[in-house]
Each structure stands twice: as C-alpha cells, then as structure tokens.
Swiss-Prot record:
Annotated protein name in UniProt: Nicotinate-nucleotide--dimethylbenzimidazole phosphoribosyltransferase
Native source species: Pelodictyon phaeoclathratiforme (strain DSM 5477 / BU-1)
Described purpose of this protein according to its UniProt entry: Catalyzes the synthesis of alpha-ribazole-5'-phosphate from nicotinate mononucleotide (NAMN) and 5,6-dimethylbenzimidazole (DMB).
EC number in record: 2.4.2.21
Pathway the protein takes part in: Nucleoside biosynthesis; alpha-ribazole biosynthesis; alpha-ribazole from 5,6-dimethylbenzimidazole: step 1/2
Family designation: Belongs to the CobT family.
Pfam families: DBI_PRT (PF02277)
GO MF: nicotinate-nucleotide-dimethylbenzimidazole phosphoribosyltransferase activity
Gene Ontology biological process terms in this record: cobalamin biosynthetic process
Entry-linked PANTHER family: NICOTINATE-NUCLEOTIDE--DIMETHYLBENZIMIDAZOLE PHOSPHORIBOSYLTRANSFERASE
Length: 354
C-alpha cells in the first residue's frame, strides 16, 4: 500500500452511531405516522450519522465530473470514437449537456475535471485541469496505468473532495465522461467482486450483439494479461481502471475523510465506489448510490454490495445525471428532518393506544 494512500485511509472513521437513537427519536416525533415517509426517513438518518450533526446543514451541493480517455477504445469496444470525449467536455463547459441542465435545475454546482483526456484544453470557466496522462494505456495488452499515475489520480480526487468541504459544500456527487469507460469498469467489477464478465458486460453507448461479444472477449483478455498484477484493490485499479475512475475512488475516500456525504452516479462511478470500499469499508457510511443503472450488471453489483439505490429510472448516461436528481431527494429528506414540526411543538395528538 502506498504510504500516501494509507495516510488517507487512516483518516476515515465510521459514522457516528451514537447519534442514531436521538435521530430516530426525532424522526418518530415528527407530525406523521412513524415511518410513513419511508426511505426519506432512512436517507435523513444516514445523512445525520454521516455528518455527525443532529441539526445537519444541506444547502451547498457540488458534482465533480471526471473526464479521461482510455487506450482500450482502440479495440473497438464502443459505438463512439475516442474524440467524443473532448467534444463532450466542451459541451459540458458550454452548458449544453444533460448534466448541465440537471445541475442547474437542482441548484448543484458543477466542475468538469480533466484527469486524462487526450486533448489540450485552454483555460475555461468550470474546467479543472488535473491531467495525469493523455489517456490510459490499452489494458488489453498491459496495465492501464502505472501505480504511480493511478496514485496521483486517486489523491487528486481526494484533494478535490477536501477542497470542496473546506469551501463549505455539504453534499458532493460524482460524475464521469470517457469513451469506452464501461470496459475498465466492468473489468474492475469482475475482479474485485468475483463476478463473471458475461453477466455484467453491457452495451455501453449502444453497441450491437457482435460488438458486445467482442467487448466481453477484450475484457477477458485484459484480465488474463493483467491477472498477476491484480494482487490488491489498488493494484487492480492501476492495471484495469482509468484516470477518472481512480479520481472518483479518491474523491469518495476524501469525502469520507472529511465526513462529507457523497452521492455516487451510475455504472462507472460505482466502479470507483467499489475500489474505495475495498480499500476502506467504512466509506459505506458516507455513500448514497443515486440510481440503478440500466447498464447490464449494475443490479448484480448493487446486490453484491448490499446497496439499495435511491432511484430506478433506466438511466445509462453517466456524467453525474443520476446523482444530480438524487441530490434533490436527499435535500428534501434533510429538510423533512430539520423543518417538520414535532407532535409536542405543534400540539398534535399522537396515535392513541389500542
């Protein structure tokens, strides 16, 4: 384990279980039948415990959309060419992508982070330049990243989470952009969760049956080529991941270290979450999985993690779109907790005894 990574992991502590009884009692005292707001109450309770605050704040929200290219795109595993990655980054910076519309609607700030796009961007508003390399190497023929580069990307994600917490953000979210990135995400799931490649490989941006079979073969080849390197979760990330996935893992770890809840987007972001969970299981206390992706395999991944995503809307876009929508529900749940009257304060009669 790299020393800098171990120092980050050592800063992550489990959520404050000591507040659980008081928070539950408060939820039960609100002017409603106990438990009648269902998962909104569960979400509010988890948020309280994660923040360690019985009167939690939630007004400032931010999503970081991490972008990177992938050498494995050369294997023809995506329906779109690699040049779409920088094109979509420009679209986001111009405000025209789905994530822009949804973050504006939800009152969420958005940063687009260049972790490894094969393009030199000028200085633009909303763009955070943290490029490690101009794309990963082809994991079908060797490791996607060196361990040094993977560590740099991971620690960059952690730094961005810490900076956001210091800037007063209460809730963070992940997003990503990178042509072919369902391929490394699937490889990471197969190795880290011990599931078959066939069961979790999906169509990504819309590949046909023939290309799907090819994608499965490429992922299996990558795992075979890099199998001896996959001795730890971090080594597996370096061998089979990508710069945006490494940054997402670090972003989640950094958020947990700062006791800041983080909303995980879909199939790709969940791969970063799996890496983070394998490195430090305590981060689960700070995670909200935003939605069940329509991408094949995400349900199996969520079941393996024992996770229950907030939404099921057949989303498969990425970018942070599911996280932006889920943030509104989380904010609503926290407002219920903070702003509803209690039976005692409102002088509303409680349920009579049987």
């Amino acid at each position: 384990m790299p020393e800098k990574l171990q120092l980050l992991l050592d800063r992550i502590k489990p959520a404050s279980r000591s507040l659980s009884d008081a928070a539950r009692a408060h939820l039960d005292d609100l002017t409603k039948p106990q438990g009648s707001l269902g998962r909104l109450e569960e979400i509010a309770l988890k948020y309280v415990l994660a923040t360690g605050n019985l009167s939690p704040l939630l007004s400032k929200k931010k999503i970081c959309c991490f972008a990177a290219d992938h050498g494995v795109a050369a294997e023809g595993v995506s329906a779109f060419p690699a040049e779409v990655t920088p094109q979509m980054v420009y679209n986001m910076l111009g405000g025209g992508a789905a994530i822009n519309v949804l973050t504006r609607h939800a009152g969420v700030d958005l940063d687009v982070v260049d972790m490894g796009v094969n393009h030199d961007f000028p200085d633009l508003a909303g763009l955070v330049k943290r490029k490690v390399q101009p794309g990963s190497a082809n994991m079908a023929t060797g490791p996607a990243m060196s361990e040094e580069d993977a560590l740099q990307a991971l620690l960059c994600g952690a730094e961005l989470a810490a900076e956001a917490q210091e800037a007063g953000y209460h809730l963070l979210g992940t997003g990503e952009m990178g042509i072919a990135n369902t391929t490394p995400a699937t490889a990471l799931y197969a190795v880290l969760l011990d599931v078959s490649v066939e069961s979790i490989t999906g169509r990504g941006t819309g590949i046909d049956d023939e290309r799907l079979l090819h994608k499965i073969a490429v992922i299996k080849q990558a795992i075979a080529v890099n199998g001896s390197r996959c001795t730890t979760p971090f080594a597996t990330l370096a061998a089979l991941g990508g710069y945006e996935i490494a940054a997402i893992a670090g972003f989640i770890l950094g958020a947990a270290a700062a006791r800041t809840p983080v909303v995980v987007d879909g199939f790709i972001s969940s791969a970063g979450a799996v890496v983070a969970l394998k490195l430090c299981p305590a981060v689960e206390d700070y995670l909200f999985f935003s939605h069940l992706s329509n991408e094949q395999g995400h349900r199996a991944v969520m079941e393996k993690l024992g996770a229950r995503p907030i939404l099921d809307l057949d989303l498969r876009l990425g970018e942070g779109t599911g996280a932006a929508i889920a943030m509104q529900l989380i904010e609503g749940a926290v407002k219920i907790y903070n702003e509803m009257a209690t039976f005692s304060a409102a002088r509303v009669s409680e349920k009579s005894g049987e």
